[in-house]
A protein has these predicted regions:
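ABC ATPase "signature
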Residues: 236-237
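Conserved catalytic motifs of ABC-family nucleotide-binding domains
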Residues: 171
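Conserved ABC ATPase "signature" region
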Residues: 22, 117, 121, 128-146
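Helical segment within the ABC ATPase nucleotide-binding domain
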Residues: 189-204
Length: 267
C-alpha cells in the first residue's frame, strides 16, 4: 500500500452563519449551515506539487487551515504523512511548514536571526540544532546579509524568503503555501517560483501544496491541479487532464466551464 504525504476522505467543513473562530466550536453540527468544504477527497504523493485553484470562497484557504490543524474538519478525515489532523495534531505539525503571503507574522523589531531562533525553539529544536539549521537555511535562502537586520527593514521579497526559511526550520515533509507570491512584483514573483521548484521541491523532495489565483503560476509549478468551487472538488488532475475534462484549450477556460457545469448540476 502506497504511503501518501496527504490524504483527504470526504472532508467537510461547515460554519454557523453568524459565528467564526472559536465561537464556531460552540454550535452543534445541526446548526452549521454555511458550507466551506463539501465531500473533498484526494491524495498527494511525497514530492508532488499540487495547486489549489478557485474563486474567493471556493474553500482553498479553509482546506489549508485544516491541513495545518488551525481548523478541524466537521466530517471526514484528513491525514498528513499518515497522521490524523483531528486526533494527532501535534504529530501533524511536526510534518508541515506553513507560509502565507504578506508579513508572515514576524516580530518586526527583532532581527531576522532572532526570529528564526525564536521559532526554532517553538519547534523544539535544541540550541545546537537551531544554529545548524539557521546556518544551512541562510545559504539556501540567500539570507546572509539580512540575518542581523530588523524584519521591519526588509523588502517584501526578503520577508517571503525569511518566511520560507522559518517554515523549513524543522525539515517538514510537506510545505503549505497560501498565495505565496501575493504582493510581489513580477520579477520577484518569478524568482520566488524558481526558488520553490529548484531549492525546495527539487533539492529536498518536499511535497508542495499551494493556493493561488495566478494561473500562469499554477501552470509553471503544479504537477496536478485541484479545482474547487463552493467547497466542492470539481477536478484533481494534471493540467492536460483538467483541460481534457472541461474540453477546453486553456486553464482559464477550463475553470469557467467546470464551474458552470457544476452550477447546472446542483440546480
Amino acid at each position: 500500500m502506497e504511503n501518501f504525504a496527504l490524504s483527504l476522505e470526504n472532508v467537510e467543513k461547515y460554519f454557523p452563519p453568524a459565528a467564526s473562530g472559536w465561537r464556531a466550536l460552540l454550535h452543534p453540527v445541526s446548526r452549521l449551515t454555511v458550507p466551506a468544504l463539501r465531500g473533498v477527497s484526494f491524495e498527494v504523493k511525497q514530492g508532488e506539487v499540487l495547486a489549489l485553484v478557485g474563486a474567493n470562497g471556493a474553500g482553498k484557504s479553509t482546506l489549508l487551515r485544516i491541513l495545518t490543524t488551525l481548523l478541524l474538519p466537521t466530517r471526514g478525515r484528513a491525514q498528513v504523512c499518515g497522521f490524523d489532523v483531528a486526533r494527532e495534531p501535534a504529530k501533524v505539525r511536526l510534518q508541515i511548514g506553513y507560509h502565507t503571503g504578506g508579513d508572515a507574522c514576524f516580530y518586526s523589531r527583532l532581527s531576522a536571526r532572532e526570529n528564526l531562533v525564536l521559532f526554532a525553539g517553538l519547534n523544539n529544536l535544541s540550541d545546537a540544532e537551531a544554529s545548524r539549521r539557521i546556518a544551512e537555511l541562510t545559504g539556501t535562502f540567500g539570507l546572509g546579509e539580512l540575518l542581523d537586520r530588523q524584519v521591519r527593514t526588509l523588502s517584501t521579497g526578503n520577508i517571503h524568503r525569511l518566511g520560507l526559511a522559518r517554515a523549513m526550520l524543522h525539515r517538514p515533509s510537506v510545505l503549505l503555501l497560501d498565495e505565496p507570491t501575493r504582493s510581489l512584483d513580477p520579477l520577484a514573483a518569478a524568482e520566488f517560483r524558481r526558488f520553490l521548484l529548484q531549492d525546495i521541491v527539487g533539492a529536498h523532495g518536499t511535497t508542495l501544496i499551494f493556493a493561488s489565483h495566478t494561473l500562469a503560476e499554477v501552470e509553471q509549478l503544479a504537477g496536478r491541479i485541484a479545482v474547487l468551487d463552493g467547497g466542492r472538488l470539481l477536478a484533481c488532475d494534471t493540467l492536460a487532464g483538467v483541460k481534457a475534462a472541461a474540453g477546453a484549450d486553456t486553464l482559464e477556460e477550463s475553470l469557467e466551464i467546470l464551474t458552470r457545469r457544476a452550477a447546472r448540476e446542483t440546480q
